[in-house]
A protein has these predicted regions:
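Non-catalytic alpha-helical scaffolds and adjoining flexible linkers that form interface surfaces
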Residues: 1-3, 7-182
Length: 182
């Protein structure tokens, strides 16, 4: 038997997969990391569900072939699992599904990372303001900015690396799906 944490469109669920370690288990093929599966859950005793059926929908095998994508995939799963314990909302499923799809479709890793972190920050309540700087002033197209990690926002700086083009891209990534941005 194996106890799993499953992220569903309805939120995070803990479930037990009985007999999944047996060689001829029907459930084993439908329960994979880096995959989206159709799973049938039956309410068990307490808060633990029982998995009665599992069928693999999409398996992102390409993630396993690139170490950097694999590591980032693990990091995303870990961050979303922790965050969804505190804020259990359906959006986590969408964010993680789209991130895995991007990692599996060989979209630029940096693009997937930027998109994921912007979504993650938004859902955890630390959304990056792309309208005002940390002092509350509107962002100016003619000026340069840097990210202030203490204030968690953009700060006006002559040596800043963020220009109007960067901010325009960040706005696009923050408001559109990863597929559209890619």
């Amino acid at each position: 038997d194996r106890i799993l944490t499953i992220l569903t469109p309805l939120g995070q669920r803990s479930a037990i997969a009985r007999g999944v370690r047996r060689e001829k288990s029907r459930l084993a093929g439908g329960i994979e990391l880096f995959a989206v599966s159709d799973v049938v859950l039956r309410r068990g005793k307490g808060s633990l569900y029982t998995i009665t059926q599992a069928r693999l929908d999409r398996f992102y095998r390409q993630i396993l072939q690139d170490y950097d994508r694999l590591q980032f995939g693990y990091e995303c799963i870990k961050l979303v699992e922790r965050a969804s314990r505190d804020v259990d909302i359906p959006e986590w499923f969408e964010v993680l599904s789209e991130t895995l799809a991007g990692l599996g479709d060989v979209v630029s890793l940096q693009l997937v990372q930027v998109w994921f972190y912007l979504r993650y920050a938004e859902l955890t309540g630390y959304e990056l303001s792309l309208v005002n700087d940390v002092t509350g002033q509107p962002l100016d197209r003619q000026k340069r900015y840097m990210y202030d990690s203490i204030e968690r926002g953009l700060r006006l700086s002559e040596q800043g690396e963020l220009t109007a083009d960067h901010i325009k891209f960040l706005r696009l990534a923050a408001n559109k799906s990863l597929r559209l941005v890619a």
